[in-house]
Each structure stands twice: as C-alpha cells, then as structure tokens.
C-alpha cells in the first residue's frame, strides 16, 4: 500500500514538473524542472515494474544526461546531448528486439519500414544539408538510430502488442525532428517538450503491467 502511494506521488510530481517545463519551454522561462523529469520517471518505473530492466533504466539515465546537455547553448553541449540520447535509443532498441525474439515476425511486417524510409529521405533532403559540414554525418547517424528505434517498437507492437510503446517512439521522433528544425532551419517550433515527456512516459508505461 505504501509503495502504491509513493508511486502515485512520484507520478504526480512527474506530471507537475512536465507541465511546468512544457510551459517554460514555450514561453522562454527558466527550465528548472527539466532536471527532475527523467529521475522521477525512473523512480516511477522501478516502483511499478515486476521485473526492472537495466537497459530501460539506462535509457532514462542517458535521456537525463541528454536533457542536462541540451539545457546549455553551443555546439558541444548539443553534440554530447545527441550522443547521450543516441545511446539511450540503442538501449530501447535492445529491449524491443529482445522481445521480438520471442515472437515470429511475418514477412509482411517488414513493409512497415517504407514510411520510415520516406521520412529518412525527406530528412536527408530538407534538414541534414542545413546541419553544416561537421555536423552533417552525426545528425544522419542519429536520425537512422532514432528511426530504427521507432521501427523496432512498431515491429514489437505488430508481433505482440505494445501500442503505447510505439506511440511513444513516434512522439520521440516528432520531438527530435522539431529540435532539428529549430536548430538547423531556425525559427520557433512548438511542442518539443510536450511530445518528449509524453514519449518517454508512454514508452516506460508500456513495460509496466
């Protein structure tokens, strides 16, 4: 009973901190709450999971590192943040593909890769060229890893269920696309943090029974 109460309290804190940070990000306010998001989500996951996955925990830790890096301006914080999030995506990919080994994948499921390839082609055409000579290839690699993460989440959903995880991966894709557009195409792009906090929550909640 006590664990349940603590879990609800932690989830409530995550929702409040998420709402505060979403508001701050949209109105150029101080991003104080951002540092608490992933630790709170990690705590919520550990309190509720029947079997705690080291790789899911690692994904949240690297997501937290990425959050901290992106709170700073400049090239190197962006590069370190990109690297941290990419490692987190590799952790998610491992968990998704590990689950896929239990189920048989029908050949028709591989057609689901087509929309992702279209997205990749559009990104290579409209976003990557604006990243600059030194950042072009790191951004390309990150986009490929991000798409693989979302695609493996989709395969897992088709094979065994897990719709929240796939929706979360799509929101992650949207959030990172908005960040790329804001960084390289310049301009105001709304919804980055809203899609991000929902993405992480849906992915993690998909592994809580």
Question: Residues of each region from the PLM?
Answer:
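Polytopic alpha-helical membrane-helix bundles and their juxtamembrane interface segments
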Residues: 1-209
């Amino acid at each position: 009973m006590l664990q349940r109460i603590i879990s609800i309290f932690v989830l409530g804190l995550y929702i409040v901190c998420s709402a505060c940070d979403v508001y701050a990000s949209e109105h150029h306010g101080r991003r104080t709450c951002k540092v608490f998001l992933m630790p709170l989500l990690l705590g919520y996951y550990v309190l509720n999971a029947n079997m705690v996955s080291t790789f899911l925990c690692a994904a949240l830790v690297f997501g937290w590192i990425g959050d901290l890096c992106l709170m700073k301006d400049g090239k190197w914080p962006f590069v370190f943040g990109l690297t941290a999030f990419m490692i987190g995506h590799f952790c998610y990919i491992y968990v998704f593909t590990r689950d896929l080994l239990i189920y048989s994948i029908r050949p028709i499921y591989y057609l689901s890769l087509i929309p992702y390839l279209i997205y990749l082609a559009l990104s290579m055409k409209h976003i990557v060229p604006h990243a600059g000579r030194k950042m072009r290839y790191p951004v390309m690699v990150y986009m490929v890893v991000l798409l693989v993460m979302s695609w493996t989440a989709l395969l897992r959903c088709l094979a065994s269920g897990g719709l929240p995880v796939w929706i979360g991966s799509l929101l992650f894709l949207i959030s990172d696309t908005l960040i790329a557009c804001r960084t390289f195409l310049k301009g105001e792009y709304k919804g980055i943090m809203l899609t991000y906090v929902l993405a992480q929550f849906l992915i993690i909640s998909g592994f809580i029974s």
